[in-house]
Amino acid sequence: MSETHLTQQKFADLPLCDEVKQALNENGFEHCTPIQALSLPVLLEKKDIAGQAQTGTGKTLAFLVATFNHLLTTPVPEHRQLNQPRAIVMAPTRELAIQIAKDATLLSKHSGLKVGIVYGGEGYEAQRKVLDKGVDVLIGTTGRIIDYVRQGVINLGAIQAVVLDEADRMFDLGFIKDIRFLFNRMPGAKERLNMLFSATLSMKVQELAYDHMNDPVKVEIAPEEKTSRNIKEEIFYPSMEDKLKLLHSLIEEDWPEKAIVFANTKYQCENLWASLEADGHRVGLLTGDVPQKKRLKILEQFTQSELDILVATDVAARGLHISDVSHVYNYDLPDDCEDYVHRIGRTGRAGQKGVSVSFACEEYALNLPAIEDYIKHSIPVTSYDRDALIDIPPPVKIHRKPHAGGRNLRDRNGSPRPSGSHRSGSGRPPRHDRTRRHS
């Protein structure tokens, strides 16, 4: 992480218990990010927090450190039962819950506290077996948590710490009734440490906070700009005929280390995956129709750089925490201005440079004025040479499984690529040496 995203505040100087400090030290966490430096002193005084912070600011570590420290310094509730967790973390998506659980497991190493995760889509009985053994910190999506609560597998009567992550997304996805259902089955707000984090502290989010929290302190780490200066933005105006060829051509020219391609519909995402797969790219598809086990496998492959490109819808990508994304391609301009910010925010994180490429086609160009008004700047326009667009092969059938082998380095004619022409660690030339960009 770049030092520009850290403060002078050291975790070692905070009044944290030794078990938490040891875990932080072993995982290389020395200095706090701004949201950690502002929120942890408040939380360590056992005061509630309503925090405004974007994804990638370190908020997950902030609330996990506070949660573990609180449980380790607070007596266990008298007569606590095996099915009663002491802390609960609610997340809007399975992928976000999984990421939080991974981070929590690292912090729990020396604490003696057990972490459990529950989410819909798979593993109902396996998750239940873990809960039956008892967990201290429960992390999950609200729907699956409610299922277990209603069956008596989980009882929330001993909750001492609550985290509601990405509260604004909870509203977007219609989960607020679920959240209120769970809050109403916990001890009163004054009997627990309450933490809420959201990209925006809208009136509805603040109302939720004040309804179920104990006079929370508002902590805001709002970026001065909607989009990071680390992200180079550009926009093309392709014809519908050129649009797919342009995407292929730019990917071949940029040869991104790790890229996400966004489209507005599942149908379009499937078409893009089929086309990129046919061209030999290592590409994964992430939509709401992809089974959960396959989703997790695709995310693991993308995170481990076994896949280079991920094609996704906005809903499927919400809550994903993937580092080192070099490029974001907006094949369709989103209808929601905030989605544009969320999309391109996948790159340029933690001080790294990123590239965002958007297409303003005939169908979605009308979305551009609202987006530029929202981000308060114009997106630089880049033209392209139609004659330089590469030919693309017919798409594979949608039902075909993603290619599991190495990246296909063949040229357009299907012959092997010359050994000296592919990219290596740095300074690697593009697949074709004709540039398509014309400033």
UniProtKB/Swiss-Prot annotation:
UniProt keyword terms in alphabetical order: ATP-binding, Cytoplasm, Helicase, Hydrolase, Nucleotide-binding, RNA-binding
Low complexity bias (residue ranges): 415-428
Catalytic activity: ATP + H2O = ADP + phosphate + H(+)
PROSITE patterns: DEAD_ATP_HELICASE, HELICASE_ATP_BIND_1, HELICASE_CTER, Q_MOTIF
Keyword Hydrolase: yes
Motif (Q motif): 9-37
Every Helicase ATP-binding domain range: 40-219
Alphabetized GO MF terms: ATP binding; ATP hydrolysis activity; RNA binding; RNA helicase activity
GO cellular component entries: cytosol
Gene3D superfamilies: P-loop containing nucleotide triphosphate hydrolases
Annotated segments matching region Disordered: 394-439
One GO term of the biological process aspect: RNA catabolic process
Short sequence motif DEAD box: positions: 165-168
Extent of Basic residues compositional bias: 429-439
Subcellular location: Cytoplasm
Residues reported to bind ATP: A53, Q54, T55, G56, T57, G58, K59, T60
Domain Helicase C-terminal per the UniProt entry, residue ranges: 243-390
Domain of life of the organism encoding this protein: Bacteria
HAMAP family: DEAD_helicase_RhlB
Subunit relationships: Component of the RNA degradosome, which is a multiprotein complex involved in RNA processing and mRNA degradation.
UniProt record similarity statement: Belongs to the DEAD box helicase family. RhlB subfamily.
NCBIfam families: PRK04837.1 (NF003419)
PANTHER family, A to Z: ATP-DEPENDENT RNA HELICASE RHLB (PTHR47959:SF10), ATP-DEPENDENT RNA HELICASE RHLE-RELATED (PTHR47959)
Function of the molecule: DEAD-box RNA helicase involved in RNA degradation. Has RNA-dependent ATPase activity and unwinds double-stranded RNA.
Protein name, as recorded: ATP-dependent RNA helicase RhlB
Taxonomic placement: Bacteria, Pseudomonadati, Pseudomonadota, Gammaproteobacteria, Alteromonadales
Chain's gene name: rhlB
